[in-house]
Amino acid sequence: DLHVYLGCEFHANMEMLPMLREQKVMTMAGSRYVLTEFSHNSEESYIRERLGALLSGGYKPIMAHIERYEATRNSLDFVEELADMGVYMQINADSITGKDGFFTKRYCNKIMKDGLLHFVGSDCHNSAKRSCRIGEAYRMVSAKFGQDYADELFIHNPAEILK
């Protein structure tokens, strides 16, 4: 059987908590996990404050596609700080496979090597322009970092959202 669960990126803003409480936006599969997106040039202080607000509100923020933000690309210490706060990190499959460029792939490998990644997303919008390469990304992670780590990112951690 195939089960489909709703969820989408929620662009960070100053009204996040009221919007979540009033169910104007959805969480991942109706859970406390919130896939949170920022503008590519968001400041560290804004990211820290918004994710901290979600944590204080009892939510479990997943920072969507961390490979796209200047703040997280320029400072692995900042990524580690957020992870230590309780923020989960997500990158896109295309970034792992190299479709988004060599430097993005190298950054993703560093994040995985340092154990800072929790989820891999497909970022599939349609089958023509953004097709799903999640299987290819899984195979690459498994070959480079081991099947146990690949299973954690692609199977076990996502399953936790559904509990």
Residue ranges and their predicted role:
Residues 11-13, 68-72, 96-99, 125-129:
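Active-site environment of divalent metal-dependent phosphoester hydrolases
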Residues 107:
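Catalytic cores of alpha/beta
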Residues 134, 138-163:
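Mid-to-C-terminal alpha-helical segments outside catalytic/metal-binding sites
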Residues 1-90:
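Extended substrate/RNA-proximal surfaces in nucleic-acid metabolism proteins
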Residues 116-132:
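Short acidic/histidine-rich active-site segments
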Residues 65, 123, 158:
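Conserved, mostly hydrophobic/aromatic
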Residues 101-104, 146-147:
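Glycine-centered helix-coil hinge/cap
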Residues 88-91, 96-98:
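Aromatic-anchored helix/helix-loop segment that forms the rim or "lid"
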